[in-house]
Amino acid sequence: AVWMVQAWWSNPTNDLLKGMGEYRQDHVMILDLTGLEAPKWNSTAYGDTVLESAEFNGTDWVWCMLENYGGNPSMDGQLAKIAHDIPAAYQEAQHMKGIGIISEATYDNPVIYDLIFDMAWTEETQDIDGWLDDYVLRRYGAYSMSAREAWDLLEQTVYHRSGNTAQVMAALPENVGRTSLPYNPQLLERAFELLLEDFDLLSASEAYRYDLTEIMRQMVNNYAVRQYNNVIDAYEAGDLETFRIEKAKFLNAFDVCDLIQGTQQDQLAGEWIGKAEDWAIRYDDFAWDCLTMNAKALITTWAGAASASALPDYAYRNYQGMMIDLYKARWERLLDERERYLIDQDPIETWNQGNYFHFYWQWVMNTPEYTRKADNSPVHIYEVAQRLLSECSVIEELPENEGNLAMNKPIEASREVNSGGSGGGYAMYANDGTLDSYWDGGPWEERPWIIVNLGRSYDIGSVQVCAYASGSRYYQFEVYVSEDGEEWTLIGAKEDEAVETNEGTTFTISAPCMARYVRVIGTFSNQI
């Protein structure tokens, strides 16, 4: 027998490894659960544990990817990191015996699983561009240049990071404040539009229709995040009319999401519950009650009343049916309370986790009859897509940015320091066309940088950089351009101590300058 030991938190400890004996390779295998995000195999210290040597004191181990905590719906993953880190571990390690997937749930982000399974057959770093060329053709059964361009944008946004994307729809309403997204949602919407361009060519593919649904689900989530920030703004301003408008738009997002989820059978509440019923039918009534109740409790209360405050909504889903009967209903309750407060200052009834437990439990014990039939037809998918683009678009036209080639283009940064607010920290705020948000790249000593990909080469006439302006702040930085992202030309530098203003610093280029990439490197800040 072989003991499979999970590397998690402070485990395995030094004493545990010693206790496994001198010939551990014969009967012990360590699963490095967070090999992608926080590997332990190449460290001698994690949690409270200090080891004698790396690779778990020279014990055989498996590189693992832990995804989809709680089965929560979110488009995320790190394609380039997977393609790099697994071969790098093979090259460096002496005791790596394979790769593994330790997801808490599946049915989302199929691309990351396709990639990691391909990595089992090579010890070389995968070229993501080439891999995506093959993937699009293999997945959709036909090649589309627009679809391939869409996947470039997906790789630069949702598949450039791990961890659930911020969401508000399935969150406990009382716990939600202003929320920010870790990438530019307009780029995701652009990817979706590109994917739709060859709909007639690709729509016979079930995988293509699934991908459209998954992107639509993420798009409506991103729209709801932005829209709820608008709700907060109106409420805090005491503007009743605007509050009602923004509230209606926010609540409509639940209807659109419910419609989207109804296109995939595995995204139906009726299918989730129905699978438990299918299993339970072979047993007695008590088993039926237990299995179906557990299926419903798992995705709502997670546990019984005694644990109501421990992990509420840990395994939340946004299944069709649940979106309206649970999530929209509880948001309507709170927003109606706030609307009444704006009208006549009626006290707001605040719910705690105990209130929400009982709200959920009523649903668990008296669940409506939900359908198990999804409409995944191309005609219906296209109709849903048009409604989404019509009612939940995040594309904004900002006239004052006419001629701004960099606005909302793909951007990468050396580092992102999230401020926790709705407009600070992430690189996407560096080129969103407004001075109300900003990018934070960390200490200037690290020479933080950002690179904007304009999509194609342009003859650039000038570059304007607006650093954060407040009080006596001033920054120094260098600006470079490149056609290929490899060879860079310095076009200007701010080296003085002039205090920053909202006009920023403009570098005018007199000679013809063709460039696709623009890079800004911070070299000094007078702020500690």
Give the positions of each predicted feature.
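Catalytic-core regions of glycoside hydrolase
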Residues: A1-S144, E155, H160, P173-V176, ...
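Core-facing hydrophobic residues within beta-strands of well-ordered domains
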Residues: M96, Y458-I460, Y474, A515
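C-terminal functional modules
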Residues: T165-S203
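Mature N-terminal, pre-catalytic/accessory segment of carbohydrate-active enzymes
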Residues: R209-N408
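Disordered, acidic Ser/Thr/Pro-rich linker "stalks" and the adjacent N-terminal cap
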Residues: E397-S457, Y468-R473, A493-N502
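Trp- and acidic/polar-enriched beta-sheet ligand-binding modules for extracellular glycan
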Residues: S414, G442-P448, A469-I528
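Short edge beta-strand/loop segments characteristic of extracellular beta-sandwich folds
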Residues: Q464-C466
